[in-house]
Amino acid sequence: GVLTDPRECDIDISVEMPKEFLIDDSMIIKPAENGKDVEVVRGPNIKPFPVNKPLGDNLEGKVLIKVGDNITTDHIMPSNSKLLPFRSNIPYLSEYCFNTVDEEFPKRAKENNGGIIVAGNNYGQGSSREHAALAPLYLGVKAVIAKSFARIHKANLINNGIIPMEFEAEVDYDKVGLLDELVIADVQSALVNGKAIIKNVTNGSFFSAYINLTEKEIDVIKAGGRLNYVKIKG
């Protein structure tokens, strides 16, 4: 056979539309009028989704881990045969966050009520794994200060209300150490201005970091992540 333009064929290709389409939605359970009264039934290995809180006026926390260049999402949240069955159990998975880099990270994060991650270039490369943002969120990570980010992981951090910042001067990376206490005063203005002045309380120094976000991404961060943002917007 050959490809033929149907307009050149002497064939009636008209289709008569029915007066109405039969719709059977009897198998669809309509949402309750008051969703607050609905109980979500979860299996023993399915835990509630972690949701961040709206951003406050100031951001402060200790450096929970300092990593080098090209940290992958698999470094951040390993996904091997032992952990895959727990993909819906973020509390359990978080115990293995950065497990291949620093086994003490989860414990350190809990002891300090969360904090900040410091990283080199291309942080979050590789798989677009959302768990690499969800596990740090569950452990209280508020921001990641890196030399540069992999694009998709940066988007996942924003969606979870974790602020991605980039060192203005890469040499400042060497001036920050593990468990240094960092403070960003008036972080709300820093988001709008696209630049944060960060005080290292531990050694008394200051350094700057860019916050390259769109207007919508800023609103998402302020809301504490995309779920909160959507809830606010209705």
Question: What are these model-derived regions, one by one?
Answer:
Residues 1-234:
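Fe-S-dependent hydro-lyases/dehydratases of central metabolism
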